[in-house]
Amino acid sequence: YDRAKIIHTTFIPYREHARLLGSSDIDEYIRYGGTLRAGSIDFANVDEQASFYDDESTRQYIDTAICKNIQHGLTTFQAGNYLRHLQDLAESGELTGAINRIIEDMNHRFLLSVLQNDFKSHDFGSAAQLLRRESNPSKRTDILDNVDRQSITERLMQLLDIKNKAQQKVNLTEAHVYEIKEYLEALELIAACPVYTMSERESAYEYTIFIQPGMRYCQAQALVYALLQDKAFNNLSEKLKLLVSERILEDVRGRMLEDIVLFETMQSSSKKQLVGKLKFAVGEYDMLIYDKEQDSCEVYEIKHSQQYAPNQCRYLLDEAMLAQTAGRFGRITKRCVLYRGAAFKASNGIEYENVEEYLKKLK
């Protein structure tokens, strides 16, 4: 051939997924994880071919379709010659767990401590905190403070193939961490998103986005499954069990929606634009789009909710935050909340835009 064009197939954008499957439901995109196939997983049947459409199961997808497939690909590519420091992890069966740890980490940090410290579920801790602070009294509960967290964590670790340092056969080093990140980048499973700050000591740093949303969602499903095996939790009313389970999944869906919007906006942005998060001493804008030629910017809040709520735009109305933003990134031309409800413009000037329609318009 006189020429060849590389077509990247790992990542399927939301608009393409919606066009091919005829569904505009962003939650379906999150649950399918960017694949074009739906199915269900039986936790008890590790041999059944499946994806992660059913929230009562994820082990098969976690073990076969994500992390173990990554491990298998690394070990078979050119007879494993490119494994380098990961050879010992692969041979001991600990590479899958290492990858799962980084994916589960709230901030997706590629740090040695993430792999060495005793495992704690960030999804569990986040959900427990949110349920304790729930603004609606009828949904406020401290039930996750009263379950057997240790046994739930151990059950989750089994599902994710995660081992604590005492059970690890391989002495992990910074080289292992670096190469795991390097391979995930090569497989187009992660991307770096800039986080701009107003700190005098650090103007920006990188946040890691996982491009396949199912890599996180299936772990949240696994946590729900592990929680449902707890005796104290199972003695609760069906209504309360559903409330807690849905809160765990909703929390993760919200964080993944932010990642999806950020990554797809970054992918469609022009060379004259900068896209990232903007963090302040207190609070942040979920997304900033800066036009270098016009010296102007747009600021966004990204919410998974379908309903309008006044506090969704509180940072977009904060005069101090707006002044700091304008001082660094120029005139603010748009203040917008992306959510799953109908589009409208509020009397305070804040635009509300449907996130699914926003993603469909990106090119």
Identify the meaning behind each predicted range.
Residues K5, K165-L172, L249, R253:
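Conserved aromatic-histidine-acidic binding/catalytic patches
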Residues T10, E174-V177, G254, E258:
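A structural signal for well-ordered alpha-helical scaffolds and beta->alpha junctions
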Residues V170-L187, A191:
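Short amphipathic alpha-helical interaction segments
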